[in-house]
Amino acid sequence: FLHPSRAWSVSSARLVPYGRVVTRSIPPVSKAALRSDTLKAFGRRKVSKMMMELDALDNEKSREKGTGPTVPSSIDWKGPLGVIKYPDPRLRAENKHITEFGRPLKELAEEMFQVMYGDNGCGLAAPQVGINYRLMVFNPEGERGKGMEMVLANPTIVSEGKDKDWFREGCLSFPGMRGKVERPTEVKIEAQDVEGNNIEFTLKGFTARVFQHEFDHLQGTLFHDRMPEEEFAAVHSRLVELEDDFVAHNPSLEDQIRRVGPKPARKLFGIL
C-alpha cells in the first residue's frame, strides 16, 4: 500500500525483472519493534476448533492424493528483496499457510519493513516481494519511529462493519497508478504474530483499509479488481502499459499472466 501522502520511489518506479531483486542500503528495522508484545494490547486467543479442523481436513485430503501435507514446514527466501510489479504471476499465485515461527520469520519481516519504508509504503504483503506465504507487515504512518509496526501471519477476517467508504488507493506493485476502492471502515481480525501467538483485534479507519488491501494480496486479489467500471476504465491504459513492459522483460512468461482485456465501453447517460 503506497502511503497516500507520498509518491513512488525510484525503485518502485521501474519494473523489477521476474526473479530479480533490488538492492537497498537501509538501516535495519529495530528487532524490538517486532517482538510479540507489540500486539499484546489487542489480546490473545487460542486457535478455534473450526480452524484446526479445516487444517486437518486439508492435510487429510492431500494424504489421500499421495501428495503429503499441502503446507510446507518452513519459508525459503534469499535477500535482498524488492517489490515485484504487476502483472508478475506471483501476485496471483496461491499463498501458503505459515507453520514455522521464530527467528527466520522475524528476519523476513524485518526485510519486508525495509522494502516497504524504502518504497514509501505503509503496507506490504509477502507475495509482493515474490514470497507466496500468508504474511503481511504494515505501519499506517509509513515512517519508522512513528505509529505501530504490525506483523501478521495467517490473517483472517472474522467480521466486517456495516459502514463503507471510498478512498483513492495506490499500490507498490502498480507504480504510477491510483484508483478509488470501496472498503468496510471496520474489520475484526484473527492472526498470529511472529512467535506464533494467536491474536484477535479490531481495526478501524485508514488502518483497516491498509490491512484489507494487504489481505487482498494474500487472496490473490489486486486492487483494480475492486474498482467500479468507470474507475477501472480510467486506469486501464496504465495496466496495459505495465503488462507490456513486463512481457518485454519476461517474454517467456507471457502465457502465465492474466491481462485485463479490452477497455470497458464508455456509457452515455447510463446507457451503452
Predicted segment positions?
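N-terminal chloroplast transit peptides
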Residues: 1-26
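Positively charged
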Residues: 22-272
